[in-house]
Amino acid sequence: MGVLQVANYLIPFLVLPIISRILGASLFGSVSYAQNIITYLTLLINYGFEYSATRQISIAREDKTKTDAIFWSVIAAKGMLLILSFAILAVLPFCMERVACDPKLYIYTALANIGIVFFPTWYLQGVQQMDKMAWANFFTKLLGAVLVLSLVREASAYRLYPLLMSASSILIGIGAMIYVIRHFGISRPVLSRQTLREVMQAGAPIFLNNVFVALYTTANMTILGMYAADDVIGYFSGAQRLIQALNMVVVMPVSMAVFPEISRRFAQSKAQGVKFLKQVLLLAGAAAAAVSLITFLCAPLMIRIMYGAGFAPSIELLKWLSPIPFLVMIATLLTVQGLYGMGLQRWAPWVGVILAVCCVGLNLWLLPLIGVKGVCISWIAAELLECLLVSSILMTKGRKLCSI
């Protein structure tokens, strides 16, 4: 299952060496920026249902009438949010020059959100059929990769790249929805205002938290687009995607492997959980530090293999970002395993708010002064600040819990 999830991320990543050489840095930057902007609309449509609706389905899974009502209410809510997202997209050309210059690129990229409306990941998670969800994601990415590699042969077809990815998302999303309806015998649509209100209210806190998280994970490129040309965005996106792939390959497997055991240790006693967390931090931190060091030393080779000579400026940016895998590993272990393991998750949204404000502020301050390097520094500062904040919470609040 974990291998399949990693593969879901790596498939589009493996398309990059070909597509980046076809498009070149400038058009690659244009496409990357469009994907970045549409991420906010995707966030709106997901709303928080991946967690809230999953929980609702899981709790009511023995009550078929209730789960059917939740299913159609979430689909309806996502449909309304999709309409709202396209209304926002229609206004963006009047607010953002980049969107006004190439509206088709943003429309084609946004079409992927139609597939997200139909794809009931939250339902499959709620009934604990994550393997089917992972396979559906896998085929979405695989179909998109095959279509892109088959049809995007020259730079002038750059808009076709997001359009084909969107088409694969829509096809697999509709297919997944039909499968769920037939396999689980979901009744015909019956909507009630009460159920619709319930699913919206349940997802609201998670949505707000996701907004703050997006402000320090996604806003860096958004703000970069206010000051930099397309080629600079392309160079940064190239380095950023490599770092994100390393995070997925290094951090995610460790987090998934450790979570059940560390939860068991914390359930036995806070002291045992803290002791085990320290051991994991030492070992996983050392491994992640090695990955960061190798990334710094091998940056020229990695960029040359992935993107070619045309992305040479990405080498320096990748070196600047090389500490990120180490910092993300530590931050993930402290936040996901530490805060949640010790029952201190109520502090997580406050950490997110502080990080969002600091990251956006740093980007707005540093970008005009030192350019794209300011984005790298802001990202590193945000991850470092998360480590410091969560460590402080664990040391102050956690010590009291351990003494009880």
Feature names for model-found ranges:
Residues 1-50, 86, 145, 204-231, ...:
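Signature of the first transmembrane helix
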Residues 1-8, 34, 39, 46-93, ...:
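Membrane-water interface segments that mark the loop-to-transmembrane alpha-helix transition
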Residues 33, 103, 107-110, 134-182, ...:
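Hydrophobic alpha-helical transmembrane segments
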Residues 35-43, 213, 217, 236-260, ...:
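Transmembrane helix-bundle signature of multi-pass secondary active exporters and lipid flippases
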Residues 46-62, 239, 243-268, 335-341:
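Helix-loop junctions and terminal segments of transmembrane helices
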Residues 93-109, 297-327, 373:
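Interfacial segments at transmembrane-helix termini and the short loops linking adjacent helices
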Residues 103, 114-136, 325-351:
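Membrane-interface junctions at transmembrane-helix termini in multi-pass inner-membrane proteins
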Residues 131, 158-165, 174-217, 261-275, ...:
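Interhelical loop/hinge segments that connect adjacent transmembrane helices in multipass membrane
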